[in-house]
């Protein structure tokens, strides 16, 4: 399925019973969060609040609130098909030279997909049907959600922030939360390693004290939105990846006030700049950890132009203790990561980021172990190969007879195959998510790897235990007579 814009996607969701229109008046202050949270935890539909209290623009929440809807947004029918997306990314990250004509022929589908990567630049777009500039800009007219009662202010959550470094060939798309502090002012909260922050730092070094241009898109098509949260190779733009997912080139249009290209399909666009000398204290906000984060100074985004469709939809979400929408996205994108990791480490059988681990803070890996110390090599690989895992605090490595997605299996492996002193690897002074207040220093903390594999010669001096196995002939015999035993017959 190809979705040219958000509305195409919503039409499909509605046909499949995956979208609920809410006509009753609902307040963006706390009430939408409460409804969205209850709905997501029950595995419910996307929500379109058509009558937000005090506003004329409807609010879309819980769009990617189930793994199925994430898969649909990527043009797949179910989550398992996302591994095909991962295989494509693995191919693009490290393409292999064809060894024969047969290899070249088998690679043609992937190369045909690559042809859809360039963007298609339009001269005009629906996202610029209505234009407010300078003094006309009033962000308070947008139904920006105030998610939790102790949040300091309303928060823009699903904005696709578009930036470009002065020496970069391509633009960067990233999603960073933005605190509303004035009619035309937002605080841009991006961490120093993220693409937008790196572009900004490069700009400040190359053009000191000059305003840094920014555009933010709200309500783009699902492929573009998901392209901004997927681990695309550094050499591939998010727009190009969205084109691969969609099967058609991503349509863009030039911003009104700068040279940045914005998604033509977007519902609402914010354009403006960051003054390198202007910062403001951000937060506190309830975030994906389930706690309120610390306050810190971040750059201020001054909005000079607000453009939109004639009948826009405001796309929003909330973050809180898992499960929340970021956790669901992490669970679905887990399937994308697996082929990328397996291309570098073929011994990996499965890789799992439990949603309750705040999307990325704990990983369970199962491997076909081949030598002593193998588990430790895989730990180091997980932490270093993809930057998405630089903040993963715990990596548990198990053998391939363990189901990485079954905590009972994993706990059994840890308690029977690992010794705390021998099998726990602790690395200090490593990068840690700034939001992780458990670390002793903001942004710097430790990591732990647990080797829960069977030990080989060189790893133990003792005879290793042999797992209990059932007799196959007995299992078959009992299978045949099980129903007749009536052990679980109704009382």
From Swiss-Prot:
**Alphabetical GO biological process terms:** ubiquinone biosynthetic process
Query: Which of this chain's residues are annotated to bind prenylated FMN?
Result: 175-177, 189-191, 194-195
Its keywords, alphabetically, are: Cell membrane, Decarboxylase, Flavoprotein, FMN, Lyase, Manganese, Membrane, Metal-binding, Ubiquinone biosynthesis
Q: Which domain of life is it from?
A: Bacteria
An annotated GO cellular component of this protein is: plasma membrane
Write out the catalytic residues in the record: 287
By its UniProt entry, which InterPro entries does this protein fall under?
A: UbiD, UbiD-like_C, UbiD-like_N, UbiD_bacteria, UbiD_Rift_dom
| PANTHER family named in the record | 3-OCTAPRENYL-4-HYDROXYBENZOATE CARBOXY-LYASE-RELATED, FERULIC ACID DECARBOXYLASE 1
**Function as written in the Swiss-Prot or TrEMBL entry:** Catalyzes the decarboxylation of 3-octaprenyl-4-hydroxy benzoate to 2-octaprenylphenol, an intermediate step in ubiquinone biosynthesis.
Q: Which family does it belong to?
A: Belongs to the UbiD family.
State the protein's name: 3-octaprenyl-4-hydroxybenzoate carboxy-lyase
